[in-house]
Amino acid sequence: FHRHQDAIANPHRPIPSNRLPAKQVLTIASVSYILCLIAGFLMSLKAGLLVIGLVIISHAYNAILKERGIWGSISLPVGIGLLSVFGALVVADRVPVKVWYVFVAIALYDFGTHITTTFKDLERDREVGILTTPLQIGVGPALIVSATATTAAFMVAILPVWTEDLLADAGWHYVCWVGIV
């Protein structure tokens, strides 16, 4: 979707350098998406429907939202966070409450880190027309949003430990996961 921008920002990569032709990339991507959809529906109807949603988020991010500042910074983390929901659907065919905590924590953390990664070359982004969150709302506010989201992610991650009996309801595996993070 952004071959012209990649040619400026990352000319050494396979697509902008023409080591990988656009038609071949489209074929590989299409086959990958089809295989993911088939695999998702083979696992369960709910998992298959979620794969459709994830494919839509992926395409929306790459085609439109990547250049829309905060919307790109929100859409990508939502898709990444939904992978935990996908895992629960595949394993249990339902989404336990703790998985929603994980989803929110992952999405918030990735939101904060996604904003942080957009600081690396603001001038180049401005030149090629990519509207990143720092360019949209300013560097200072973007730093505050990033730090707040990252901090909130850790707070959400430990909520089940605070609100439920530590080992009985939250589970030792969840407590270990939060401890590792």
Language model feature labels by segment:
Residues 56-63, 81-82, 104-119, 179-181:
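Transmembrane alpha-helical segments that form the membrane-embedded catalytic/substrate-channel core
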